[in-house]
A protein has these predicted regions:
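N-terminal, charged/glycine-rich beta-strand/loop interface patches
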Residues: 49-50, 79-81
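Short, conserved charged micro-motifs
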Residues: 73-79
Length: 144
């Protein structure tokens, strides 16, 4: 009998930005990463006589949500990115990051380029530390 194994400790995630620097999220308090495609890969058009046409759609962009423990090194790095993005006065100055997520056990890598912070995350102040969710837009998301 064959088994498939998923091992979160074997997932490596690196976020790189030309002005902010690089953060190995897997060594800095990564909580959870969700990669979502922005569009559909196909759609159907039905003609008047009932014939179905399959439309192949080319979408490569998506969103990435990175949840990290409040107060972690990853949270510090991502807050730094948010402060940098808020302070930009010249829109031509925007620099885009790259996120690479590698599942060494599963044997695949997700690469996201043209990564920009969508908004400054909500902050919750409670008796115990929680998680902070940072949402990024990516111009291109691919999987190898």
């Amino acid at each position: 009998m064959a088994y498939n194994v998923y091992s979160f400790p074997d997932v490596k995630a690196v976020l790189n930005h030309p002005d902010i620097g690089q953060c190995s999220l897997h060594q800095s308090g990564m909580g959870k990463i969700t990669v979502s495609a922005a569009g559909d890969l196909a759609s159907h058009t039905t003609t008047a006589d009932g014939y179905v046409i399959v439309n192949r759609l080319k979408t490569t962009n998506g969103t990435i949500t990175v949840e990290v423990p409040q107060g972690s090194i990853a949270d510090w790095f991502l807050r730094k990115w948010a402060r940098w993005a808020r302070s930009l006065q010249d829109p031509s100055r925007i620099a885009l990051g790259v996120l690479t997520v590698t599942d060494t056990v599963g044997g695949y890598t997700i690469s996201a380029t043209g990564v920009s912070l969508q908004k400054v995350p909500d902050r919750v102040f409670d008796r115990t530390a929680g998680t902070v969710a940072y949402t990024f837009l990516a111009a291109t998301v691919s999987e190898q």
